[in-house]
Amino acid sequence: GKQLLPGGLILQWLKIPSSAAVKAVTLDNGNYQLSGYKWPQSFGVLFAVFATKVSGATNEAYAISVNHNSTDVTVTWNARKADDVHILGIGKL
């Protein structure tokens, strides 16, 4: 989803379901990577982005790759997980 905020800020989020883990590509270093996910709208300026799973009382951050002027989102992690991944980004249009 997305939410426009005062001052031209935009907050966007998406959830990659746990069922998507089976589509992850194994990298040479043994990590797993999922791509093919997209923001609702591209950021003109990207201030911060964060990806995490929330499972009980445990939060775990993941490496994430996004660029301004693109809607593409790629997430990398070090073990095949069966948890939903939540991604949040903030920036300007």
Roles of regions detected by a PLM:
Residues 1-6:
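Short acidic-hydrophobic surface loop/beta-edge motif
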Residues 7-93:
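Extracellular attachment/recognition segments
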